[in-house]
């Protein structure tokens, strides 16, 4: 089994307990990160009627927050879609959202028309994409000229100190055990800290975004650098 297929199967296995585990393991603070990110994107977006796509949507956390955030921003959603390669994650998402289109597909091969999307988001999923540059190229392809990409991701540690020590201890010792207890799949939650450390630095990821056609990469960290937000705009030429 290829690495990407193994990752997808892992998410299939933990899908039934995914929402519960997320809220407990992040102490619920991931919802705050998502809301702040959506609010910032909508402040930057000039369009009032939006076509939004959430890639690696999982059980639909970002779908719900996009719906709430767009309403608060006094804008409208023309079409919102969730895309994920995990059939079991989408099964859970469809239970929660009856009027949202969910598509089973990978980030590296989006079944969407070119230049058809105003906002594309991917939250805590890009590090799980094996063909990352191909996926970023797909994001650029489907976004309209001037469209906005939002990437939320756990940050690779770049400095020391007490916060970094506590973060590493939690990720390597507490999270795998607690996540494994909730999901009955410790291996899946042991994968998380390893995937974070193998991901790019913010400078490296910003360079990758620019290399496939994005500009004005805006970066912000949350909760002492635990989570990172990247907002980039597709070149309009």
Where do the model's predicted regions map?
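Conserved alpha-helix/loop element of class I SAM-dependent methyltransferases that forms part
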Residues: 28-49, 65, 69
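A conserved beta-strand element that flanks and buttresses the S-adenosyl-L-methionine
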Residues: 121, 150
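A short glycine-rich, Lys/Arg-flanked "PGG" loop and its adjoining helix->strand segment in the class I
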Residues: 133-148
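A short acidic, Gly/Pro-enriched loop at the edge of an enzyme's catalytic core
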Residues: 108-119
């Amino acid at each position: 089994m290829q690495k990407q297929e193994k990752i997808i199967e892992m998410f299939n296995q933990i899908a039934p307990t995914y929402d519960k585990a997320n809220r407990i393991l992040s102490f619920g603070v991931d919802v705050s990160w998502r809301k702040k990110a959506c609010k910032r994107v909508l402040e930057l977006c000039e369009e009032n009627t939006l076509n939004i796509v959430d890639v690696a949507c999982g059980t639909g956390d970002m779908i719900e927050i996009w719906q709430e955030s767009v309403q608060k921003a006094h804008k409208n959603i023309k079409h919102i879609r969730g895309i994920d390669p995990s059939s079991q994650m989408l099964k859970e998402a469809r239970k929660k959202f009856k009027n949202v289109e969910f598509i089973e597909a990978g980030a590296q091969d989006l079944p969407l028309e070119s230049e058809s999307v105003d906002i594309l988001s991917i939250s805590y999923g890009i590090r799980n994409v094996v063909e990352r540059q191909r996926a970023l190229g797909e994001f650029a392809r489907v976004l309209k000229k001037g469209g906005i990409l939002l990437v939320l991701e756990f940050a690779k540690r770049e400095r020391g100190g007490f916060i970094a020590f506590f973060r590493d201890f939690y990720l390597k010792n507490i999270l795998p055990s607690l996540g494994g207890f909730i999901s009955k799949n410790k291996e899946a939650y042991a994968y998380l800290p390893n995937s974070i450390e193998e991901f790019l630095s913010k400078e490296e990821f910003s360079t990758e975004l620019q290399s496939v056609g994005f500009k004005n990469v805006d970066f912000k960290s949350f909760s002492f650098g635990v989570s990172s937000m990247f907002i980039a705009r597709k070149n309009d030429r």
